[in-house]
Amino acid sequence: MCSSDLEITLIQKDKVEVKFIKKIKQANNPTKIELAICLVKKTPMEIILQKSTELGVSKIIPIVSERTEVKDLNYERARKIVIEATEQSNQLNPPEISEVKKLKDFLKNLDSSTKLLFADVNSQTILKNDNIKKGEALSILIGPEGDFSPAERESILTVPDVKSFTISKNILRSDTAVITAISLVNFVYFNS
């Protein structure tokens, strides 16, 4: 669905003809995909904000874990980046950027109707079509540089209906992991 400029070319009692002049904006991705990402340094975080917006996430949740070095987010700069990326990718609405959350609080308050997809460096499981259902709300969780601690991993893997999956045989930088994970989830979702 998109917004368009229209010109009415004919009005009669039983019909109206319109001419499409130009498409204005593409409606956002119909999937509700959230990105829960552990905070990283400024430049990679800006890339994460930009690329996740371009790839259609509806919400970005900055996470602080035991091994997260950065503890806060410049919200003014973050909003500017997602607004620019929204315009560049011809979408209508920028993603919501939530307040920074501790990992344990994020896991505790995760909506029961949202499926948690854990991009896990230790997983050998490939995300498949039967792991995601059309219309299902999804939250992709990506860890910090140095990965989650063993206790955090255990907490994540005990979330009901969590799906742990691999995104690469290599260890990826956070910004590369975000692009890869969102692209993979979008691909699987739209082909399910």
Language model features with spans:
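Structured adenosyl-cofactor binding patch, chiefly the S-adenosyl-L-methionine
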Residues: P150-S192
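Generic structural signal for helix capping and beta-alpha/helix-loop junctions
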Residues: E69-V70, I126, S174
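Short, small-residue-biased leader/transition segments that mark boundaries at the very start
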Residues: M1-S3
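RNA substrate-binding interface of SAM-dependent RNA methyltransferases
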Residues: K23-K115
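Fold-independent oxyanion-binding glycine-rich loops
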Residues: I21, L39, V100, A119-N122, ...
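Active-site/ligand-binding-proximal alpha/beta "capping" segment
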Residues: L110-E154, D161-T166
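A generic structural motif
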Residues: K13-F20
